[in-house]
Amino acid sequence: MAGHSKWANIKHRKARQDAVKGKVFTKIIREIVSAAKQGDPDPDKNPRLRAVIEKALSVNMTRDTINRAVARGTGGDDNDNMDEVSYEGYGIGGVAVLVETMTDNLNRTVSEVRHAFTKNDGNLGTTGSVAYLFNKRGEISFNDTSLEDEVMLVALDAGALDIENDGESLLVITEWENFGHVKDALNAAGLVSDNAEVTMSPSTSAEIDNVADAEKVMKMIDMLEDIDDVQEVYSNVNFSDEVMAQLEQ
């Protein structure tokens, strides 16, 4: 949990930086269109669409922009057809990396993804090489641990799988399909989370305890996230406290 929250902090800082450039908006709109095209346009009946709308709202995308993207997805425009492909590989130190993409040119995408791995002493693996190390789930976090009893009561009653407390924050874990329902229940009880997302959570972690390797991993992930076709990058990296302190300087 501690390692996860530290890595999440780095990811969220980068997400805010990307949002300024509009890159996050572009990627989320693409995902909304795809989710609406492949499922029900009503987010209450489409867990995937609900999850990506929550993501859009978390970066302050307007409801109007979201609704237009949903309308695009239900309009049947062939120009919006994209292949959704996941790539798997390893970074330095045995760090497992899962890359989710949406693309209209598979050759371009795999070339750019492979380059990001090899440029940073990693390697692109075969399908199934690391995916088994990740579980898709909903995560709802609270920075105020004093809310534990209230959060636990509401979340478990709404069907949450577990609540973790690492002494610094609370993490509510849900099945990804039930993420929206649990979040709504918490909101209705006045328990507004500090972060909420559907993610691929690693079942094991790869420890990095030196700055050189950590910087290499960070650079690789930055390069992957900067690829236009890449939607999400997940990793099981865990930095030691000493390395984290130096990375945050």
Curated annotation (Swiss-Prot):
GO BP: regulation of DNA-templated transcription
Localization per record: Cytoplasm
Entry's Gene Ontology cellular component terms: cytosol
GO molecular function: DNA binding
SUPFAM superfamilies reported for this sequence: YebC-like
Keywords: Cytoplasm, DNA-binding, Transcription, Transcription regulation
Lipid metabolism keyword on record: no
Gene3D superfamilies per record: 1.10.10.200, 3.30.70.980
Location, primary (coarse class): cytoplasm
Pfam families reported for this sequence: TACO1_YebC_N (PF20772), Transcrip_reg (PF01709)
Presence of keyword Transmembrane: no
Family matches, as PANTHER family: TRANSCRIPTIONAL REGULATORY PROTEIN YEBC-RELATED, TRANSLATIONAL ACTIVATOR OF CYTOCHROME C OXIDASE 1
Protein family: Belongs to the TACO1 family.
Protein name: Probable transcriptional regulatory protein Pcryo_1479
Annotated organism of origin: Psychrobacter cryohalolentis (strain ATCC BAA-1226 / DSM 17306 / VKM B-2378 / K5)
